[in-house]
């Protein structure tokens, strides 16, 4: 075993020990295949009012512009599939937001992984990324062999489905690189057929400006009336395309205590949601990603669903 293989194996083993679901590594270079796709997606205004998607176009496609002398992209996934879910007949929030804000949880684990690399390998330059910088997470995870990008544009695996977060360490260390896996979507169109707002405009292409997650989280203005009655009771985010995916039959509950829901969340009825106060909002969602939409945003969403 050469040094690169040894270092790669050490990093992967520690990632799993820290609770990550999987870890893969790819060479830090320009994403040639993704460049024209991203350009076309932006040109067709599929980012809606997410102006930040238009910024740092070059950096999104080349990690060497984000990290000096970048050699490797270490991609990691962290399971968030819950053991318990909201009851039927109430307003719904995406399962990723049940527990503590994933940014904070994952950053803590990435910091530990960086410290491990420094201790075991030596001084390694790099940066950690958790859905908060111009990095194409899913593209790097796919290049690293962690899964394939499904027709709903989420990363998929045969063994664990798609309910997991993706994070990266971009480092100036040469490592052994993994290979992409085969696409196993086949002729299935379950996600396309089930999308309440027809946001999956063709296989592998999601029009972000039509997605319920966009309307309930990203959009700051009023939700267009043309979508009234099409939200299937989703008040924050939407999991429909993942819920109907056959590969998610194999999703297993996470083992991260911080992702467990607030005790009051699962028992909220529609009436509770409609009468929610700012105090209750702060109590239940103080540490959740739901706080991103703020109390006023959640109220707007619920009013739209009534």
From Swiss-Prot:
The keyword tRNA processing applies. GO terms for molecular function: 4 iron, 4 sulfur cluster binding; epoxyqueuosine reductase activity; metal ion binding. This is Epoxyqueuosine reductase. Monomer. SUPFAM superfamilies: alpha-helical ferredoxin. The active site is at 131 (proton donor). [4Fe-4S] cluster 1 binds at residues 185, 188, 191, 245. It comes from Cellulophaga algicola (strain DSM 14237 / IC166 / ACAM 630). Belongs to the QueG family. Catalyzes the conversion of epoxyqueuosine (oQ) to queuosine (Q), which is a hypermodified base found in the wobble positions of tRNA(Asp), tRNA(Asn), tRNA(His) and tRNA(Tyr). Residues 173-205 form the 4Fe-4S ferredoxin-type domain. [4Fe-4S] cluster 2 binds at residues 195, 211, 238, 241. It catalyses: epoxyqueuosine(34) in tRNA + AH2 = queuosine(34) in tRNA + A + H2O. Its main location: cytoplasm. GO terms for cellular component: cytoplasm. The keyword Hydrolase does not apply. Binds 2 [4Fe-4S] clusters per monomer. InterPro entries: 4Fe4S_Fe-S-bd, 4Fe4S_Fe_S_CS, QueG, QueG_DUF1730. Its EC number is 1.17.99.6. Keywords: 4Fe-4S, Cytoplasm, Iron, Iron-sulfur, Metal-binding, Oxidoreductase, Queuosine biosynthesis, tRNA processing. Pathway: tRNA modification; tRNA-queuosine biosynthesis. GO terms for biological process: queuosine biosynthetic process; tRNA modification. Its cofactor is cob(II)alamin; [4Fe-4S] cluster. It comes from the Bacteria. It is found in: Cytoplasm.
């Amino acid at each position: 075993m050469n040094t690169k293989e040894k270092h790669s194996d050490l990093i992967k083993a520690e990632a799993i020990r820290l609770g990550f679901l999987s870890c893969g590594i790819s060479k830090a270079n320009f994403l040639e295949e993704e460049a024209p796709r991203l350009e076309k997606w932006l040109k067709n205004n599929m980012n809606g009012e997410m102006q930040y998607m238009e910024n740092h176009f070059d950096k999104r496609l080349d990690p060497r512009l984000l990290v000096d002398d970048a050699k490797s992209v270490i991609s990691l996934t962290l399971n968030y599939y819950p053991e318990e879910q909201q009851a039927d007949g109430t307003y719904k929030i995406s399962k990723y937001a049940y527990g503590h804000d994933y940014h904070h949880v994952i950053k803590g684990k990435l910091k530990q992984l960086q410290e491990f690399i420094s201790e075991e390998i030596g001084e390694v330059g790099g940066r950690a990324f958790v859905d908060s910088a111009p990095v194409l997470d899913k593209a790097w995870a796919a290049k690293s062999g962690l899964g394939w990008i499904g027709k709903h544009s989420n990363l998929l695996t045969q063994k664990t489905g798609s309910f997991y977060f993706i994070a990266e360490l971009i480092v100036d260390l040469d490592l052994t690189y993994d290979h992409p896996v085969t696409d196993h979507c086949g002729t299935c169109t379950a996600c396309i057929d089930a999308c309440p707002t027809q946001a999956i405009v063709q296989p592998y292409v999601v029009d972000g400006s039509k997605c319920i997650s966009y309307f309930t989280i990203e959009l700051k203005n009023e939700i267009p009336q043309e979508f009234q009655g099409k939200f299937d009771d989703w008040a924050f985010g939407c999991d429909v395309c993942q819920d109907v995916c056959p590969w998610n039959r194999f999703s297993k509950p996470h083992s991260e205590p911080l992702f467990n829901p607030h005790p009051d969340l699962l028992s909220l009825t529609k009436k509770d949601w409609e009468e929610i106060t700012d105090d209750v909002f702060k109590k239940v969602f103080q540490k959740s990603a739901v706080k991103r939409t703020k109390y006023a945003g959640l109220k707007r969403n619920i009013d739209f669903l009534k």
